């Protein structure tokens, strides 16, 4: 088998690459995917979002090493092992990120990836339903919508934010991210609108696009050039040849793993693994970043939450309704209200994110209390903690070693304590008076810094937004892995395009910027002129210097 372009991974970026690289019909494209089909309600029904992430069929099922700052807990680190990758098992929340995120990328050496450069690509990929005119795309492959917003708890949350003095926003993916508002979802016609549904399946209808299901073992490098990919399928090892380029889009865990298995990475580590060094790039696997979050949960004194739908019988009713009509509760991920807030004066961009949910549930999907309730997933999104991905062994089937070093920076503790206290302030507004019962978690007895820290050590979890392990930067940056054209430094014919190349984590969920990365990388690969830079200026809070709201 051979193709002009061989893409490893059919996730958010890989699917977009397959679509754009094959668009004019001139190039043959072959996608390698270790997982399988996304057919069935567990993936396609939005309300079933907790299921695919817990199923080995769809998830690589990685765990971190014991995290010393989190009571040595091993933190769940899911990645999609299915067409569409993690866009097929995620929460379907769509966030572009803040303009300052991408300006920071350029400052860190990713020339041509400032907000003015990437905004046109966000517009190209979007089919926005109800977004801010002039700031959103309307005819792209990726449908983005808002939920029905029928539960009164959503309205209470947004009204509470206003009462606390915070901004509201009509479209956080438009000119103004900061504030309380309606959350956007990658859902269309009642179905999860993954990268597979948006990009990959339409691309596979073209004669010049193919897919092979198999495990990528390593990239074949001959005389300093990537010429193919060694894969294993059906117990047999074979090589897929690339006549032009190999593009790695295998996730922030598996992309650096593949590079290292292929001899690209920190020289000493590769020597320790018995792998011949093809390119000594110490940045491969370094710079691992992620978002953390905890659940803040409250009893609802009125029976208006989704608690009544948690018993198996009523889940079955919702599932049957969805199967018949693609409607009802099953057609929403139930994340329909949110907030993007600044933790302190002097910040130009938000750094705290809220996902509001009209039910109080545990990470396993069970009720957090025997009563109606509501909760927010709250996290500090600009952590300074950094981790790494390394090889466990030279065996391609071995899981990588994930060391996040969560909460290793003192500022993280200060910010998360603020998150706890700020959430109490928001839930304490009069908008919640009709609904507010006892605090379930952290609990009303958790007040001091020491008590909050103890709660955080036991309850912080990943928000599943890993990035940065194949950092994009200037060629003279010793820690950069790819240049701003996504080319692997030191190896010809090889690129990386996924969230692993982010120089710095963006503020918000990563599916959107990962797809954008695939879109923009495709133009670089094809040698096209980049889309014209935008001259639109995003809203920055005029009170930012003196107030947090």
Curated annotation (Swiss-Prot):
Catalytic residues (UniProt): 465 (proton acceptor)
One Pfam family here: GMC_oxred_N
Gene, per the UniProt record: betA
Catalyzed reactions: choline + A = betaine aldehyde + AH2; betaine aldehyde + NAD(+) + H2O = glycine betaine + NADH + 2 H(+)
One of the record's GO molecular function terms: choline dehydrogenase activity
Keyword Magnesium among record annotations: no
Reported function: Involved in the biosynthesis of the osmoprotectant glycine betaine. Catalyzes the oxidation of choline to betaine aldehyde and betaine aldehyde to glycine betaine at the same rate.
Family: Belongs to the GMC oxidoreductase family.
Pathway: Amine and polyamine biosynthesis; betaine biosynthesis via choline pathway; betaine aldehyde from choline (cytochrome c reductase route): step 1/1
Enzyme Commission code(s) on record: 1.1.99.1, 1.2.1.8
Annotated PANTHER family: CHOLINE DEHYDROGENASE, MITOCHONDRIAL, GLUCOSE-METHANOL-CHOLINE GMC OXIDOREDUCTASE
Record-level GO BP terms: glycine betaine biosynthetic process from choline
Cofactor field: FAD
Keywords from the UniProt entry: FAD, Flavoprotein, NAD, Oxidoreductase
Name the UniProt record assigns to this protein: Oxygen-dependent choline dehydrogenase
């Amino acid at each position: 088998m051979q193709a002009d372009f061989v893409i490893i991974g059919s996730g958010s970026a890989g699917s977009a690459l397959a679509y754009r690289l094959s668009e004019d019909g001139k190039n043959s494209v072959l996608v390698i995917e270790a997982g399988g089909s996304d057919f069935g309600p567990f993936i396609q029904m939005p309300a079933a979002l907790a299921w695919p992430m817990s199923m080995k069929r769809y998830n690589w099922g990685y765990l971190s090493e014991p995290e010393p700052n989190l009571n040595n807990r091993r933190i769940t680190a899911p990645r999609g092992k299915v067409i569409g990758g993690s866009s097929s098992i995620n929460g379907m929340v769509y966030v572009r990120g803040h303009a300052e995120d991408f300006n920071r990328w350029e400052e860190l050496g990713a020339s041509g990836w400032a907000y003015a450069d990437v905004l046109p690509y966000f517009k190209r990929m979007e089919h926005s339903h109800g977004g801010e005119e002039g700031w959103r795309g309307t005819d792209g492959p990726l449908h983005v919508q808002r939920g029905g917003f029928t539960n009164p708890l959503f309205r209470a949350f947004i009204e509470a934010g206003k009462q606390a003095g915070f901004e509201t926003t009509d479209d956080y993916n438009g000119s103004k991210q900061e504030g309380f508002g309606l959350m956007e979802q990658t859902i269309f016609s009642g179905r999860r609108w993954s990268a597979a549904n948006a990009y990959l399946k339409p691309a596979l209808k073209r004669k010049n696009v193919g897919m092979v299901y198999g495990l990528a073992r390593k990239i074949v490098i001959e005389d300093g050039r990537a010429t193919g990919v060694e894969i294993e399928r059906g117990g047999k090892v074979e090589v897929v040849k690339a006549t032009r380029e190999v593009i790695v889009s295998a996730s922030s865990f598996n992309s650096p793993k593949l590079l290292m298995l292929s001899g690209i990475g920190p020289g000493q580590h590769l020597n320790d693994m018995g792998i011949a060094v093809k390119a000594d790039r110490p940045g491969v696997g370094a710079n691992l970043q992620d978002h953390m979050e905890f659940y803040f949960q409250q009893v609802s004194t009125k029976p208006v939450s989704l608690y009544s739908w948690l018993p198996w019988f009523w889940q079955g009713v919702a599932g049957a309704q969805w199967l018949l009509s693609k409607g009802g509760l099953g057609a929403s991920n139930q994340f329909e209200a949110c907030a993007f807030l600044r933790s302190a004066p002097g910040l130009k961009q938000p750094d705290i994110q809220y996902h509001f949910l009209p039910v109080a549930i545990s990470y396993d999907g069970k009720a957090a209390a025997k009563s109606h309730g509501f909760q927010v997933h709250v996290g500090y999104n600009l952590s300074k903690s950094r981790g790494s991905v390394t090889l466990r062994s030279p065996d391609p089937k071995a899981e990588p070693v994930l060391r996040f070093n969560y909460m290793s920076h003192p500022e993280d503790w200060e910010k998360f304590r603020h998150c706890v206290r700020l959430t109490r302030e928001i839930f304490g507004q009069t908008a919640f008076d009709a609904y507010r019962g006892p605090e379930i978690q952290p609990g009303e007895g958790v007040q001091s810094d020491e008590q909050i820290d103890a709660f955080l050590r036991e309850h912080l979890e990943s928000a599943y937004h890993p990035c940065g392990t194949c950092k994009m930067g200037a060629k003279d940056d010793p820690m950069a892995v790819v240049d701003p054209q996504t080319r692997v430094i030191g190896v010809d014919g090889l690129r990386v395009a996924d969230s692993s190349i982010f120089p710095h984590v963006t503020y918000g969920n990563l599916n959107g910027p990962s797809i954008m990365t695939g879109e923009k990388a495709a133009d670089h690969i094809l040698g096209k002129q980049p889309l014209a830079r935008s001259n639109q200026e995003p809203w920055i809070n005029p009170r930012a210097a003196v107030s947090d709201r």
